[in-house]
A protein has these predicted regions:
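Low-complexity intrinsically disordered segments
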Residues: 92, 96-135
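Hydrophobic transmembrane signal anchors and adjacent membrane-proximal interface regions, especially
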Residues: 3, 58, 73-75, 90, ...
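Short, solvent-exposed aromatic-acidic interface loops
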Residues: 67-80
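Low-complexity, intrinsically disordered terminal/linker segments enriched in charged
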Residues: 77-99
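N-terminal domain-onset segments
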Residues: 1-44, 128-135
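Amphipathic, interaction-prone secondary-structure segments
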Residues: 28-67
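Alpha-helix boundary/N-cap detector
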Residues: 7, 11, 15, 83, ...
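Generic structural signal of hydrophobic/aromatic residues within well-ordered alpha-helices
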Residues: 16-20, 24, 70, 112, ...
């Protein structure tokens, strides 16, 4: 399996790609056009907080995939009105970036993406806070 990361608008690291491949490989259907990977911390809630859920969608064929998007979710609202919303959304195919304030060209995320990725990898690989599901 190969995930294209060179030449992207954002500085996706080899460490990120290698970890993603390692998580996907045991579960991936050989001819799958889409691979969706969900990362969830079971205790995350609107009331108590925790580690944001993350969804990564890959698209491709013949074992070669592109990152379609990486979305980090958070709760917005209070009490029964709280709902999961996109906190950060890196849309590689569409070339857009979304945060809680609006939509922007993806290049706007050049500074925040490395910080997000480093934090995410720490939570996932070093602290093991996520349950990972490959669809």
């Amino acid at each position: 399996m190969r995930i294209q990361y060179e030449g992207l608008a954002l500085p996706v690291t080899k460490r990120f790609i290698d970890a993603l491949i390692k998580a996907i490989e045991p579960h991936r259907e050989p001819l799958a056009e889409f691979v969706c990977v969900n990362f969830r911390e079971p205790k995350y809630s609107a009331e108590d907080g925790g580690y944001h859920p993350v969804e990564i969608l890959l698209t491709g064929t013949s074992g070669r995939y592109d990152i379609c998007y990486i979305t980090d979710f958070c709760y917005a609202g209070i009490g029964d009105c709280a709902e999961l919303v996109k906190s950060l959304d890196f849309e590689f195919i569409a070339g857009t970036f979304q945060d809680m304030t609006g939509y922007y060209p993806i290049e706007v995320a050049r500074e925040i993406y490395p910080i997000w990725e480093d934090n995410f990898l720490t939570y996932w690989l070093d602290m093991a806070v996520f349950e990972v599901e490959v669809i």
